[in-house]
Amino acid sequence: MLGLKEKICLYGFNNLTKTLSFNIYDICYAKTEREKEDYIKYIDEQYNSERLTKILCDVTEMIGAHVLNISKQDYEPQGASVNVLITEEALPVALIDPSCNKGELSYLELRDSVVGHLDKSHLTVHTYPEFHPNNDIISFRVDIDVSTCGKISPLNALDYLIGSFDSDVITIDYRVRGFTRDVDGRKCYIDHDIKSIQDYIDGETLKKYDAMDVNVYQSNIFHTKMMLKDIVLNNYLFNSDPYELSPNDRREIRDRISKEMIEIYGGVNIY
């Protein structure tokens, strides 16, 4: 196990940066152009910037941080982005930069433009709907980054993030960068035990997925990818009833969905 057997008394502020990169893929079967367009519109409404903002604010609360500023934007024809600047400790109002809105979205609505902040502690989310006219399989990707410094850890929000989306395929990257020092001046490159990202995911959630790790312990790099085990066809058809299809059609669609998930899971074109 990589990490610390006992707690270390640090000197000054904890300078370690912990970054969690979380990507989920939602797969759907849509045969006609109308079905594809309707699915993209549905996804765009389902995961607009307002809902994504709420998810990131919930994550902020779960990891024990505080919101300093929120920037959000819905895009045309589709897609959305949200950026949340956070701090480990609550700051007195007098110390908060006047440009920060403290998460008060009514203030955002009064501004013609919103400029995102860059800081060591922040959350970002972007959505990427994807389809091709020659393919009946549509995918939707959500890309979330949580970067923290200090004692707070983004790993504590993993279960909530997985449950917040229709997660068919998931890729998770976690890394720790920088160093901090103990009271004797000795450098510390990681401040918690970790052998796998899977240790931070609920066992009941893991039962639903095939999962594998690719970790580089010496570099404090951890990677886990997950693929849903059971394909329930009704969850993948948009505005269609699977029982209106012939058994052969159902098998073919299930097979195509499975192949799409396997390729995304492996990160390589196979079929």
Curated annotation (Swiss-Prot):
Q: What does its PTM field state?
A: Is synthesized initially as an inactive proenzyme. Formation of the active enzyme involves a self-maturation process in which the active site pyruvoyl group is generated from an internal serine residue via an autocatalytic post-translational modification. Two non-identical subunits are generated from the proenzyme in this reaction, and the pyruvate is formed at the N-terminus of the alpha chain, which is derived from the carboxyl end of the proenzyme.
User: Under which name does UniProt file this protein?
Assistant: S-adenosylmethionine decarboxylase proenzyme
Catalytic center residues: S121, H126, C149
Q: Which domain of life is it from?
A: Bacteria
Q: In the UniProt record, what gene is named as encoding this protein?
A: speD
Provide any one GO MF term from the record.
Answer: adenosylmethionine decarboxylase activity
Under HAMAP family, the record lists: AdoMetDC_2 (MF_00465)
| UniProt modified residues of type Pyruvic acid (Ser) | S121
Q: Which family does it belong to?
A: Belongs to the prokaryotic AdoMetDC family. Type 2 subfamily.
Q: Which GO terms describe its cellular component?
A: cytosol
Which InterPro entries does the record associate with it?
AdoMetDC_fam_prok (IPR003826), S-AdoMet_deCO2ase_bac (IPR009165), S-AdoMet_deCO2ase_core (IPR016067)
PANTHER family in the cross-refs: S-ADENOSYLMETHIONINE DECARBOXYLASE PROENZYME
The residues annotated as site (Cleavage (non-hydrolytic)) are K120, S121
EC? 4.1.1.50
Q: Cite a single Pfam family from the UniProt record.
A: AdoMet_dc
Please give the subunit comment from the record. Heterooctamer of four alpha and four beta chains arranged as a tetramer of alpha/beta heterodimers.
Asked if the keyword S-adenosyl-L-methionine belongs to this entry, the reply reads yes
Q: Which reaction does it catalyse?
A: S-adenosyl-L-methionine + H(+) = S-adenosyl 3-(methylsulfanyl)propylamine + CO2
Sorted UniProt keywords: Autocatalytic cleavage, Decarboxylase, Lyase, Polyamine biosynthesis, Pyruvate, S-adenosyl-L-methionine, Schiff base, Spermidine biosynthesis, Zymogen
Provide the cofactor note recorded for this chain's UniProt entry. Binds 1 pyruvoyl group covalently per subunit.
Q: A Gene Ontology biological process annotation?
A: spermidine biosynthetic process
